[in-house]
A protein has these predicted regions:
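An amphipathic, hydrophobic-aromatic interaction surface with interspersed Lys/Arg
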Residues: 1-144, 149
Length: 149
């Protein structure tokens, strides 16, 4: 992990990644000035920062491995999934998904959840729901359900 962090000297971290909240980690992933995000367009950032966080924690890979994938190009499937995404609503949908894991009522509360706890809950709650083509359908259904309320 330390070796990986040192490979991004243009973005010094104020505290260890696993002591950050979900909100703080998301801010780093969406920061316009960070080394990682300069390589991505806004749609790709939204897709990777939230979608990949779910994907890699669900598959129980280490956070360092997840972060290293930020440097890789998107697969054709990922490009298709991120194409045409409205950034604010996509981010809101993913945060609402976070909220559902914790049975919370506000996104503000979800953003304060420690990232380490979030990853543990994801591992325990959705380990059987491997990231797949169906995952976007599940998110879309949740989004429609939320809009109806």
């Amino acid at each position: 992990m330390q070796e990986f962090i040192e490979s991004f000297p243009s973005y010094p971290l104020e505290k260890p990644i696993l002591s950050m909240t979900v909100g703080e980690f998301s801010e780093i992933m969406l920061d316009e000035d960070s080394y990682i995000t300069k390589m991505l367009n806004p749609k790709e950032r939204a897709y990777i920062a939230f979608g990949r966080l779910h994907q890699y924690s669900i598959e129980m890979k280490g956070l360092a491995d997840y972060l290293k994938t930020m440097q890789l190009k998107l697969t054709p499937e990922e490009q298709a999934a991120s194409r045409g995404v409205d950034l604010p609503s996509f981010v809101e949908r993913m945060l609402l998904d976070t909220v559902s894991f914790f049975h919370l009522n506000s996104m503000a509360e979800a953003e304060k959840i420690p990232l380490a706890d979030y990853l543990v809950v994801l591992k325990d709650s959705v380990a059987t729901a491997k990231y797949s083509r169906n995952y976007n359908k599940i998110l879309e259904q949740k989004s429609k359900t939320h809009r109806k309320k």
